[in-house]
Amino acid sequence: MEDDAWLDLVGISADPPNRRNKCEKCKRPVVVCWCPALPHPPEAVSSQIVILQHPAEEKRSLRTALMLQLGLEPGKCVVYKGKRFPNHRNHADLQRILDSPQTLLLYPSRDSVPLEEVDHSAGPYTLVLIDGTWPQAKAIYASSPALHRLRQVKLIAVGISDYIIRTQPTEGCLSTLETAAQCLAVLESRPELRQTLVRPLHTLCKYQLDNGAVEHQSKEFLLKNNQYPKPIGKRLSRLLRNTACDGNEET
């Protein structure tokens, strides 16, 4: 009996189990590859997108920054990772970008101006985006003095996110891909560019919905409609009441 057990053990393969074949480009399993939805050839733009990515974003299973990188010509979207910028891994390259007068930072501060009002004829521009949750983005900004010197811009008309399989904080929150695509559509004066670059996200969401995922509403929507499953504090409750009152006055 014991000898048979040892024979069974010897017969077990030492090789790791076979995993699903993955696409070389998007690194997704082939059956859920969104590469066919990418623009072919990649979009040629004069602007450049620089993404400062919080390390936690790299762990997310559904990341959209790669969609942007593959949807644009090589070098038109670069990603730097960290919690403070520049850092020892990217100091020289990123510092040159941050020192350029043509570099803009998308950040909703008091000093930010609508991207639509920037003089597009003075371009091309490099647009810096911070990729992370809002608390992560604020922490990156606070710990990166080099970002404080950049001209700051914001998007006015953002609409509702198409990333419907992920819960967004508010109705106006967009994924990294959607944000960059909208900015490029403005900077390049090509409104159709947003839809073209976001197409892989639509493909991803459709596959997930077809295979059991559910469509998500934003936390703001759930809270305003008394559908949020967790208790909220008095401060947030008061803010929501005031927002509702302001909305009623406008209508």
From Swiss-Prot:
Catalytic reactions on record: a uridine in tRNA + S-adenosyl-L-methionine = a 3-[(3S)-3-amino-3-carboxypropyl]uridine in tRNA + S-methyl-5'-thioadenosine + H(+)
GO molecular function list: metal ion binding; tRNA-uridine aminocarboxypropyltransferase activity
Residues bound to Zn(2+): C23, C26, C33, C35
Signal peptide bounds: none
Record carries keyword Metal-binding: yes
Keywords: Metal-binding, S-adenosyl-L-methionine, Transferase, tRNA processing, Zinc
GO cellular-component term (any): cytosol
Superkingdom assignment: Eukaryota
Summary of the function given for this chain in its UniProt record: Catalyzes the formation of 3-(3-amino-3-carboxypropyl)uridine (acp3U) at position 20a in the D-loop of several cytoplasmic tRNAs (acp3U(20a)).
Family: Belongs to the TDD superfamily. DTWD2 family.
PANTHER family cross-referenced by the UniProt entry: TRNA-URIDINE AMINOCARBOXYPROPYLTRANSFERASE 2 (PTHR21392:SF0)
Protein's UniProt name: tRNA-uridine aminocarboxypropyltransferase 2
Organism: Drosophila melanogaster
Gene that this sequence comes from: Dtwd2
